[in-house]
A protein has these predicted regions:
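Phosphate-binding glycine-rich loop
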Residues: 27-74, 88-92, 98-100
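Conserved coil-to-alpha-helix start sites within the AMP-binding
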Residues: 80-86
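Active-site phosphate-binding strand-loop segment of PLP-dependent enzymes
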Residues: 104-186, 191-193, 197-198
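Hydrophobic residues in well-ordered beta-strands that form the structural core
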Residues: 71, 77, 98, 150-152, ...
Length: 358
């Protein structure tokens, strides 16, 4: 029996044709196709500047470098996140300060960051997990009052909105991912968006070892590294962008089925505010006996994925700081059910049927 993967992306013959076109036109490294992709993203998100980069993690690291974050600074991030924001801070020597998440949603509880702010606090990174918006209005008020930068981690939130517009466009810098399990994907890749020209100019230098171009370099003037994306990846990303509305519609359909059809009381749905424009890329549940559920589903050829650990579980980040750490319910019970831009409705209905029979 064919296995149902936890994620299934859609790649078509048209994607392959565009990749082939870029290849035969010798658009291999970063070039014209990438610049076209950047313009398309800026138009889509209604933002002035887009800088395409190697991946979403690089986007976060570059953003911190751009804003001058260093070992003398502290950066506030939520306990529930992929590890990338914390690792990016750690690489630069900045102290990671963990803020609580909301009680019933795995996103930053903005009201609880006030007592985390010190004279060393330089930035806050709200993480818009699974397309969910943090309270950006309150966060911006707090940041402005305390002269703190905001970097939105919108890796899982491309196309998601709140009442103020697209997530990732409501701060100093917004970081996005194009990895496989996203609403649009180029395999790997990412981008940074901003409305501030000086940040865009600096990010373009950081992307290529601190230089604007690699020919006729007279002097090394700025810090940077190789954070470039390729035209091959950008060609694929452009075609994926054209599928955005179709992908969004499909993901919303899957979300509605899981939300409405699962009746097992041991599977507690974690909601996404689709009425406000949030897009649920994944389908998340709190499962009382997660190990048992994973085992039963796997016996039925259904692959699920447990939530990743809390950031507070990363001992290497806090080795010099005492902390009282209690595992969150999201880390302990969270489970991703099969989804994806190419996940069939038949697969989803099978998952529902098995879950309701447990």
């Amino acid at each position: 029996m064919k296995k149902i993967n936890w994620w299934n992306s859609i790649f078509t013959n048209k994607d392959f044709k565009e990749l082939s076109k870029a290849y035969f036109n010798k658009n291999i490294s970063q070039g014209a196709v990438t610049y076209k992709f950047e313009k398309l993203i800026s138009k889509f998100l209604d933002i002035k500047y887009t800088i395409a980069v190697s991946n979403g993690s690089s986007a976060l690291l570059m953003s911190l470098i751009c804003l001058g974050i260093n070992k003398n600074h502290e950066v506030i991030i939520p306990n529930r996140s992929w590890i990338a924001p914390a690792n990016a801070c750690n690489i630069l020597g900045a102290k990671v300060v963990i803020a609580d998440t909301q009680e019933d949603l795995p996103i930053l509880n903005v009201e609880k960051i006030i007592n985390k702010i010190t004279k060393k606090t330089k930035a806050i990174i709200p993480v818009h997990l699974n397309g969910r918006s943090s309270d950006m209005l309150l966060l911006k008020k707090i940041a402005k009052k305390n002269d703190i930068y905001i970097i939105e981690d919108a890796a899982q939130a491309f196309g998601s909105k709140n009442k103020f517009g697209f997530l990732g466009t409501q701060s100093d810098l917004g970081c996005f991912s194009l990895s496989v399990a996203k609403i649009i994907s180029s395999g790997q890749g990412g981008f940074i968006v901003t409305n501030t020209k000086k940040y865009a100019d600096k990010l373009r230098l950081i992307r290529t070892h601190g230089v604007a171009q690699v020919e006729n370099i007279e002097k090394w003037k700025n810090i940077g590294f190789n954070f470039r994306i390729t035209d091959l990846q950008s060609a694929l990303a452009i075609q994926q962008l054209y599928k955005f509305n179709k992908n969004k519609k499909h993901l919303l359909k899957i979300y509605k089925i899981y939300r409405d059809e699962i009746s097992n009381p041991n599977f507690i749905h974690i909601p996404v505010d689709t009425n406000s424009g949030e897009i649920p890329v994944y389908n998340e549940f709190l499962v009382k006996n997660r190990k048992k559920a994973i085992k039963i589903l796997l016996q039925n050829n259904i692959i699920t994925r447990p939530f990743y650990p809390d950031i507070l579980s990363a001992d290497y980040l806090f080795k010099n700081n005492k902390r009282n750490y209690k595992v969150s319910k999201f880390s302990k019970y969270g489970l991703y059910l099969p989804s994806g831009t190419n996940q069939s409705i038949a697969n989803v209905m099978k998952c529902v049927s098995i879950i309701n029979s447990i």
